A protein has these predicted regions:
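A glycine-/small-polar-enriched, mobile loop at the entrance of the PLP active site in fold-type I
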Residues: 13-51
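Short strand->helix junction
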Residues: 42, 160-161, 358-359
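Conserved PLP-dependent catalytic core of the aminotransferase class-I/II
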Residues: 55, 59, 270-304
Length: 377
């Protein structure tokens, strides 16, 4: 009996992807071993942090890195670093009034719940443009929003087929506009892995001053971990404000276990075979599509990319029953044995995303869908 059995918590097959609400991802056995090794012995946290940050920067081709407890934490600390840079003094010596005068420029079409991390610091977000408008945005819209109180420009990179419309402007132009006004840019790439080259593409190749990523998504680190990468000047400030030091980042504690495990996961990730992983996902999708071909109430097709714009395939299973809704199908799958969690995204069926599946789980999904097919009227 494992801990979930003891607690009476049903284990699920994750067919949605790296969503926090279902636990994000799985750590590898190597990562789990490194996490346990870190837990068994004490270490000076600041010394451990310095070494892990330096090695992570080397692995990701960045000037500097900071391992923290979430991507939201990375956004918060990046913003604090930019506020400190703006005033040219220690953030911890600033007044609430001084912080409240600071502004971050962002795009309306990228307004997401996670940008509250910046507002929690006390700064204001100045949104420009229109939400999800499928039209080209003028560069002057962004440039005119930058003023003497602007400390940072925030951008959430996505592919055109991902969350946001093309009207949001591209990252290269956004960086160019911000830098023409001497304002640093944070690229929020929380779920923008794969491809792994995004770990250095946004910063080293495209010029963003900082980029942040979730550690608990495709990096396959601990769920409570995040990564901030970028310019040494800003990362040095962010590190000085982070745990275990006193100040605004003290509340965002990350244990030695999570730091070591995240570093281990990153090391494995940058050395992994992306093509082999892509081919595995393609094979899983083909397996589902071919096995549902004879079903009466289901048909399946390959879709691309996935919901976060990541370059990985999914399958969409169309529900052809007139007596069962997609919501009911999701409930049947979630409450079955095995429990399978999947989303519909306002379409007449369910998506099956292979990115978090283990070997053999697609076969269980296929068997369950065939069983449901026999039961539907």
């Amino acid at each position: 009996m494992n801990i979930y059995d003891e607690l009476g918590i049903p284990k699920l097959i994750n067919a949605v992807g790296t969503y926090t609400v279902v636990g994000g991802t799985r750590m590898s056995e190597e990562t789990l071993r490194d996490l346990c090794d870190a837990a068994r012995s004490f270490a000076e946290v600041e010394k451990l942090q310095d070494i892990l940050n330096r090695k992570t920067a080397e692995l990701t081709n960045n000037e500097a890195a900071l391992l923290c407890n979430s991507c939201s934490c990375a956004i918060y600390l990046a913003t604090a670093a930019c506020v400190a840079r703006h005033y040219g003094k220690n953030f911890n010596n600033l007044t609430a009034e001084e912080i409240s005068r600071c502004e971050v420029v962002a795009l309306w079409g990228q307004h997401i719940p996670y940008d509250h991390a910046m507002e929690q610091l006390g700064v204001k977000i100045r949104f420009v443009g229109f939400p999800n408008m499928q039209a080209e945005m003028s560069h002057s819209v962004v440039k005119d929003a930058i003023n003497s109180n602007t400390v940072m420009c925030y951008f959430a990179p996505r592919t055109p087929d991902g969350y946001y419309g093309e009207g949001c402007m591209n990252l290269s132009d956004f960086i160019s506009i911000a830098h023409s006004c001497n304002i640093p840019v944070l690229a929020d790439g929380a779920a923008q892995l794969p491809p792994k080259h995004n770990l250095w593409r946004f910063t080293r190749d495209m010029g963003a001053d900082m980029a942040c990523f979730s550690g608990g998504k495709d990096l396959c680190g601990p769920q409570a971990s995040g990564l901030l990468l970028g310019k040494l000047e800003l990362l040095k400030i962010a590190t000085e404000l982070s745990f275990p030091r006193y100040g605004c980042g003290r509340i965002m504690k990350i244990g030695r276990e999570e730091m070591v495990a995240l570093y281990s996961a990153i090391r494995q990730y940058v050395n992994a075979d992306e093509e082999a992983r892509l081919q595995w996902c393609e094979n899983e999708v083909k397996k589902l599509v071919s096995n549902l071909a004879e079903c009466k109430h289901f048909s399946a097709e390959r879709t691309w990319p996935n919901q976060a714009g990541q370059p990985l395939p999914r399958a969409f299973v169309t529900l052809k029953s007139e007596t069962t809704t997609p919501a009911q199908l999701r409930d049947i799958l979630r409450n079955g044995n095995p429990g399978i969690i999947c989303y519909s995204e306002n379409r007449p069926g369910v998506y099956i995303n292979p990115m978090c599946l283990a070997d053999g789980e697609m076969e269980q999904i296929i068997a369950r869908l065939k069983e449901i097919d026999q039961q539907l009227q």
